[in-house]
Amino acid sequence: MRIYRISHFADLSGDGGRRASARWHHKGRPVVYCASNAAAAMLEAIAYIARGDPALLPSTFQLLEIELPDDVNREIVSLDWLPADWKQNLAHTRSLGDNWLQLQATAVLVVPSALAPDTTHFLLNPAHPELLPPGQGKIHIVRVEQYPFDSRLFEGQVRKP
């Protein structure tokens, strides 16, 4: 199966997770966030990185298409397991993700999207044996597209000076 990621770098190191907390982990933990389709990956970038402002989308962004073989072990987080307020309850989702990263039981954690109903995201644990060595494990990048955002997404918005 193919999964997608928006990133400055064409790698799966998880370095961004070391630098900043996100919905499913606390800062300091290497993790790679991916989406089930390119549109969902782009939506996440617009919502979280640019906060809806095209001026904040770096021109260095690229869309990574990643091969995730069916035989890679994964854990699936069902909506039934999450509290009703999971989208606002970052303490809960971050704790869940941190525990998954620490246990290293699977290489992939499949989670629901908070932005797009019926969409899933894939968290990759770059420290898991199935992903090692980085870039040479079972999961790998198959295509890179430079700055995939269409200018029509931001028509009519005023860019900040």
Where is each model-derived feature located?
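Active-site and NAD+-binding cores of ADP-ribose-processing enzymes
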Residues: 2-17, 25, 52-161
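Extended catalytic/binding region for NAD+/ADP-ribose chemistry, centered on the ART fold
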Residues: 27-48, 122-130
